[in-house]
């Protein structure tokens, strides 16, 4: 079975915003590379990733919390309903063989932080964790400065192509993709 990439992102984005288009491109490229995609299942970038993956022929899992809404976006093909937001977050982390964090708000930051800390504390096996774009660079830099042991666990990728190449190299046996070097955090 194809590896699952859990994608973290905001519900507060709409077409034609740049972050929505970025998320759509990410979903499509993940599907084309052979990944299944999991998202929080709702609107915004979660919808855009789901839409991109579905339109590219991929499989999409949406994890929704009944405390928020049990209705996933129309592009989700498999819906997992859990009781609470925190259950949803932990299920997305458990489902993922790798992760991508899109630009987002406090909820997206919480998702990125939980995956990062669970890898750091070895509560889950090491998995590729990609932060997409410059948006996350200052936050990751500050955390890595404060805690050197967390350094290198999150890769900042400057493009969808770079992010998918890194995930493919790590997770797809026989992949011809080579990780594309990223810019160092300053």
Region roles according to the model:
Residues 98, 149-186:
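A charged, well-structured terminal subsegment
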Residues 17, 48-50, 72, 110-112, ...:
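Short glycine-/acidic-enriched loop or helix-start segments at secondary-structure transitions
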Residues 44-103, 107:
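Acidic/glycine-enriched connector segments
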Residues 1-61:
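Glycine-rich beta-alpha loop segments
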Residues 71-74, 145-149:
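Short, conserved catalytic or adaptor-binding loops enriched in Gly and charged residues
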Residues 63-66, 102, 118-142, 149-152:
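Short, acidic/small-residue loops that bind anionic groups at enzyme active sites
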Residues 86-123, 130-131, 176-181:
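Active-site/ligand-binding-proximal alpha/beta "capping" segment
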